Amino acid sequence: MVIQVYVEGGVINGNVDATTASNSEALREELNRFMQKALGREDVTIVVKKCAGYKNAVKEFINSEDIQSTYLYVDLDRVPELREDWFNSLVEDDISIPEDRKSRICFWIQEMEAWFLKQPQAIEDWASDEGYLRVAGQEAEIADHHSIAGKDIEHLQHKASDVLATILRQKFMLEPRNGKKLKLRYGKLRHAPGIIAHLSPAALIKRDSELERFCEKVKDQADDM
């Protein structure tokens, strides 16, 4: 069984430079690999389709012909209790999602980067493998950073991407060039693929109800075939 997942993120190949296009494809590939591992099923093939902005992803999802083989995975951009507000915001833009498709929509709450903050060791491992240098005085583990330690990641007051960017900027820097020390500045297309590659699907499922819901729904569908 083939499952197509329309996702927010990446760029549509066209008038973009080669590096951006390559990074965008790397993001799609890593999401594809991660979701496949999360499912743990050899009888299901995941095909992630990058759609740039979330509205474009929604439109592609709505216009897909085979309802049973398609899902949508996008940022909720708000706390989970305000899920209906996301649907209402689309109606305001004259985008209506058929009722029979709403159950096939899953969310990153509040953003995809929440996955990374829920599994800070993945960030540590990625930074180490990339050879980033630790800033002096910032030896404490990312898990103990005041912005996420002991907090519900899905209810952070600031965007997960901003929190991640702050953590990376405070804790890591690049190899000095021409005598200049450059702090690590987060870029989704540049850095997210590498962090995703270090995530543990089994561990993340236990901390992310939306990812768990996606996997269980696909598994149930496969079992019924």
What is the role of each PLM region?
Residues 2-16:
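Catalytic nucleophile-elbow at a beta strand-turn-alpha helix junction centered on a G-D-S/GDSL motif
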Residues 1-2, 17-48, 52-225:
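C-terminal accessory helical subdomains adjacent to catalytic cores in phosphodiester-
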